[in-house]
Amino acid sequence: MTTANRILVLFCLALSATLAVNAQDDPRWAVVPNINDLDDWNVQPNSPALAKAIGDAAEYVLRWKAPGSAEDWRVRRPQVERGLRKSLGLETLPPRTPLNVRSVASDDRGDYIVDNLIFDSRPGFPVTANLYRPKTRTAGRLPAILSPIGHLIDDGKRDTEVQARSIKLARMGFIVLSYDAIGHGERMTSGNTHHEGGYALLPLGETITGWMVWDSMRGIDYLLSRPDVDPSRIGITGNSGGGLNALYTAAVDDRISVVVIVGYTFEFNNWIKYGGAHGTCSYLPGLFREMEWFEVAGLIAPRPVLMLNGERDSIFPVSGARRASNSTKALYSVLGHGDLARFYAVPEQGHAYSRPYREQMYGWMAKHLLHEGDGGPIDEGSVETLAEDDPRLLCDPDERLMLAAPSVVELARRAGNTASDDLSAAPAAKSRDALRAFIQDLTAPPEPEPHNLMPIRVERSEREGEPEKVYFLSEIGQHIPGLLWVPPAGTPTARTIIVVDEEGKGAVAESDLVEPLRRAGNAVLAIDPRGRGETLGHMGNRTNNYHLISISMMAGRPLAGRRGFDLTRAVDFVARRDDLPLDNLTVLGRGDDALPALLAAVADPRIKRIVADRFVSSFVSQMIPAHLPTRQQLHREWNQSLMRRGKVSGADYTIDLASVIPSMLRYGDVPEIVSLLADRKVLFANPKDGKTRNGSPYPRRLERLTSSQDLTVTQEPLSADQLKEWLAR
């Protein structure tokens, strides 16, 4: 080949490669040009922090394997049960207080009767329910079925699919109790939605899911109080959130003898990666660290369980349902009961409890509770339901009862106040040691040996006052970007101040704090801990905040604690730099990121001064209802806004749910955390709960500490001058 030919061939190859690259990047051929336009159900997001959290959680849950023998399960089962009860917040069951059952209406429908009932699952906490029962009485007692409702926000138990299955079951000879879930149907009132109520309960060590399960357990109590119900024949079935309720209730209450789970069968490992974001009830603290889904279902064994999932279900993908059901069936087989666990992927069906699902359920219930048939589908026949807005199914038509009843948030605040008071009265040494250990666990490194920081200077400007752009690795896969400002040339660096802000380092850069602090001789390092600023990312019209919070919590790594760890690594970064003094190191946390600053200071004695700006003075103040005057706004907030932002906006202030730590109030409130820093200087400025409309008692508890430690509490907004004056003390 001549030299000219070689040159021509190389040119053609280069041109082909260029055209291929251009074709690959050409937006004309892109189906979804922007990944942010995709829905978040089945797509891993473009968030470094969330990708890291998902990867870690999925890796951790892989350790849970199906038992190889009945003996293996005998050993493993108590561990799973303890872990599940702990995650649900049902380690100790609430007292079984009087149900106070009220029958408010009865509707004779010919061959069946519908009673409208209200019972109290807790004192003053009403549950609205419909009881479907056969009109013709037979000799002996009848089997009963609990029918918990999923996320049917407006219609609840009046949904036509709920009515249809209840009517058919009553005609088959069952007594059926359908009841509104907390925050749904007639119980959808301010302070009861799963996001508001769920996050209000977490600091107490309780969950909205545990409360839903307790509603179901009290529903069983009611059924067993009826002379026409056979206590040995109790079934439960529900879809989506109702399937969740059926699964967990059956797992912890062996009075249930038959289970049908619809639209809630999934493998945790699969769902973590591809399941997207869901309601708060799906996220149980630390569950991924305790078990896989099939092990929860294994707690039901050897009772019969039917798992139904639509082939077109986009919320709980059928691939994960098949994996989970295969593992569940394998566990049942190991125990010698392989025929009592069945899975069916319903063709052409999405996420619902439509007729094809119901007919499968009828056959399963008939076989195991009526001792009829082989468990195959039973035709539903003709079923006439009421319109979903028909008032005949309402228990509280004028809403007087529900509006007068305390909400989950109100009840959580009452319990929170009691817990906080008890903490302040607890023996100091014992409670302080327990709190310190709890915080050390929250902020603990993921591995015994720290990962290499790999600090990198991305960009350094020669212009006066411009920040240096840096980043380092907090742990493998978790990069922390930062902006570093140094004092003017010729001015010695007096101290280093690390700043975190709930709005990210960009908010610090645009604040009026940096320049005065820099000119006063301070180096200022503003970082984005995981899930802040550029590490957060978006998916569609949502930030990834809520999804990141939820995955981190289920993995047993609450985000505030992980951000506290990131701050201790920022201290490591400062220690690596010869130009940044470590003496008198100060950490400033703004908004809800004041909590990671406090946690980091408890964990790391190298932090000598701590500033908490615009945080709450008590974790009870995190328990707030969304400020939404109308039911329509409440519906929209439940289903959209909270999941888009991961925040609750109350009448006086907003809470970022990332600052909510499960079981926190079992160990300490904000004043107790501050008291652990008695050997350091602390400035607590402008607490967001200090100027509420109705006043707040919590800042006063914090102020009482000023007599025993170097603590400054001010209700005024933090200014650069105030901060400089405090730093000079």
Regions from the language model: what does each represent?
Residues 136-140, 194-239, 256, 541-591:
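Gly/Ser-rich "nucleophile elbow"/oxyanion-hole loop immediately N-terminal to the catalytic nucleophile
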Residues 1-9:
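Bacterial N-terminal signal peptides that target proteins for export
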Residues 183-195, 270, 531-546:
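Glycine-rich "HGGG/HGxG" loop immediately N-terminal to the catalytic nucleophile
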Residues 152, 219-289, 570-676:
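Primarily recognizes the serine-hydrolase "nucleophile elbow" in alpha/beta-hydrolase
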Residues 129-131, 139-150, 493-502:
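Short beta-strand element of the alpha/beta-hydrolase
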Residues 159-177, 509-526:
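Short amphipathic alpha-helix adjacent to the substrate-entry channel of hydrolases
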Residues 8-18:
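Bacterial N-terminal signal peptides
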Residues 24-127, 137, 301-303, 308-481, ...:
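Alpha/beta-hydrolase-fold serine-hydrolase catalytic core, especially in secreted/extracellular enzymes
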